[in-house]
Structure formats: C-alpha cells, structure tokens
A protein has these predicted regions:
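Glycine-rich beta-strand-centered segment in the early N-terminal region that forms part
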Residues: 23-38, 50-109
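Short, well-ordered loop/turn sites that connect or cap secondary structure elements
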Residues: 99-100, 159, 243
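Short glycine-centered segments of the SAM/dcSAM-binding site in methyltransferase folds
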Residues: 104, 164, 247-248
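A structural motif shared across PLP-dependent enzymes of the aminotransferase-like
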Residues: 111-124
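Mid-domain Rossmann-like dinucleotide-binding core that forms the NAD(H)/NADP(H) cofactor-binding site
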Residues: 140-211
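A short acidic, Gly/Pro-enriched loop at the edge of an enzyme's catalytic core
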Residues: 219-226
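Glycine-rich phosphate-binding loop and adjacent beta-alpha segment
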Residues: 230-298, 330-336
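C-terminal capping/lid region of NAD(P)-dependent oxidoreductase domains
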Residues: 297-301, 315-336
Length: 336
C-alpha cells in the first residue's frame, strides 16, 4: 500500500511517499481503508520532535523526556503520522462484533498514529465509530480529536445555560469543537483567535470574537464563568480578573506552574479554580458528536484538501499559519 513515511525528524521534506506492507487485522481488529486524515498539531510535533525544546513542549517539563523516549530519541519509532481519520471497513477480525465490512467509520488512534496510509488496523474496542452519514469522509475526519478532547475537558467544568465562556485558541481542532459544544450547551461564547481566522470562528457560532493581535481579552473589563485555554499561554495571575468570583480557568495545555496553581486553588478553596487535566478517550464522545453532526448542530468546515502525495506541502501550508479551518489529506477519490 502507499503511505507517507518519515525515518528522521525534521522539516516537511522528511515526508516521503513509499510502498509499505498492507496490514492484516488481528482477531479483535478492523482493517480500514483510509479516505481522509487531517494535519493536526500532533503530526507537526511528532515530525519535528528532535528539534523541539522542553520549553516549546506544551505539557509539564517532567513529561518531556518520557515523551521524547516514547517517540524515539534520535529517530522516530512510529514512521507513519496521522492520529485521526475517516474511511471504510474493508475486513474484520474473527472476534469483532461492532463492525462489518462496508461500514463507514471515523476514528482517533492517538499516539499509535498511522493514518497517512491507504490502510490502517484499529482495535474494535478503540475510539472508532460509524461516521455521520451526512458528512463526507474529509469532513468527518476533522472531528474525532477535537470532539474527544473538548468533550472530555469540558466535563471537568460543567456548563450551565446562559453562562459566559471564553475559548482562547478557538480556531484549532479542540477550540473549534469547544466553541460549538459550549453553544450547544447554551453558553454565551467568545472566541479568541488571530486575524485570518475571525470569520471561521464566527461561522462556528461564537457570539463574539476577539482578535488577539488587536486586543488583550484580559484588559477589556469582561468577566467569564469559564476561560478554556487551549494553548496554555496565559497565567492565572494575569487573567483571574477576567473570571467571575467562582469562575474556572481550564487548560488543555499547561506547564508545571499551572499545575501548582491548580493545587493552590484546590487547597485554599477559593471561589476561582484552575483545572489542568488530561482528556479521556471515550468512544461515546464520538457517538455523541456524530449525532450532533447529523442534526446539523456541529459543523465541519475545511480550509483545503491535499492528496496523499502532497503531504509535505500540506504540512508547509499548515505551518505557514494562514489556514482557516482544518487541512485534510485525502487518500482516495471517495475521501475528497
């Protein structure tokens, strides 16, 4: 089968189209013909991990070295990128009961990766579900990562109708899904993003948008019941005045300082709280997003598609920083 392979860390130039063996499903696995996979932050990080410093790593510093060892210190252990996808089940293992050949699915495979290829094997107990029937493969492929992360993290800070929420980093995979989920829950949503993506965030349903290149949301006098910081670039001290007395600062990416702030607010039992958490990968979140997408309450807006052989160009396009919505690699005509 065809796949995009990288055997060394570096720029998009390390990505090469190659012929590799087609996988065969184990008794508890499904073989999926991949039609589409988006280029996300995890792909860019994994491709260039050797050149990433601990300060650039969007998690606490003690996790940097274990992560580097897991990915491969000098060269990548996983040589095919792609952690989310949409495609069609081609074959199933003898013990599989959830799926059958012909099923159209979407999935998140996490650090295992492997979606930049024509085929991938996924455990039938994994984070995989039937895709929304009203979405194309390319559209459906953009949903799993954001759906799982945003759904899981928002459960840490349950929203009530009418509450005010600010999403910092509203145009990325997690942020764009968080905007839509918060709106679905009845919140008043403000999205923070850069100039090129203001229209995109508005199209997701945000009530207000803030261009961070023109305005500092911590200085505009507004207060929020929840600030969901996807990027983890702000400090609690700087934005606590933008929280209501019982407001929550929820982080998807964070450093040790934020963890200490979380412990401090928990110990002092002050009204305001800092929450740092890892997302749980639950297939039910995919099912829930599928139903919302079928009902037209979740949108999948694509910036641009690239064919598999242009994966390197897709990475360059994403790294240039001008994208408005997900960028998708299509691996067969039906996935476009």
């Amino acid at each position: 089968m065809k796949a995009i392979v990288f055997t060394e860390y570096g720029s998009p130039d390390v990505l090469h189209l190659k012929d590799v063996p087609k996988p065969f499903p184990k008794e508890n696995e499904i073989l999926v013909r991949v039609y589409a996979t988006p280029v996300n932050y995890g792909d860019l990080t994994a491709r260039n991990f050797a050149n990433l410093t601990s300060s650039e790593f969007n998690m606490p510093a003690p996790l940097f070295f274990p992560a580097r060892l897991s990915f491969g210190w000098n060269k990548p252990k996983t040589t095919i990128l792609g952690s989310e996808l949409a495609g069609q089940v081609e074959a199933v293992g003898a013990a599989v009961t959830r799926f059958r050949p012909g099923d159209q699915v979407f999935a998140y495979v996490g650090a295992k990766m492997g979606a930049y290829a024509e085929y991938i094997c996924i455990p039938d107990t994994g984070t995989v579900a039937l895709k929304p029937a009203n979405l194309t493969y390319a559209e459906a492929a953009t949903l799993p990562y954001g759906a799982i992360m945003a759904s899981s993290l928002l459960r840490k800070a349950p929203l009530q109708p009418g509450q005010k929420v600010l999403i910092n980093g509203a145009s990325g995979g997690i942020g764009s899904m968080a905007v839509q989920l918060a709106k679905h829950l009845g919140a008043e949503v403000t999205g923070v993003c850069g100039t090129p993506r203001l229209a995109f965030v508005r199209s997701l349903g945000a009530d207000k948008v803030v261009d961070y290149t023109q305005e500092d949301f911590t200085q505009n006098g507004e207060t929020y019941d929840l600030i969901f910081d996807i990027l983890g670039k702000r400090s609690f001290a700087r934005l606590r005045h933008s929280l209501t007395p019982n407001g929550i600062y929820l982080l998807a990416s964070y450093k040790m300082k934020a963890v200490l702030q979380m412990l401090w607010t928990a110990v002092t039992r002050s009204g305001q709280k800092v929450i740092c958490a890892f997302a749980e990968e639950k297939v039910q979140d995919l099912v829930s997003i599928r139903e919302l997408a079928k009902a037209g309450q979740i949108k999948a807006i694509i910036d641009r598609c690239f064919p598999l052989e242009q994966a390197a160009e897709a990475h360059r396009y994403v790294e240039a920083g001008g994208k408005q919505g997900p960028v998708v690699i299509t691996i067969a005509g039906e996935g476009e």
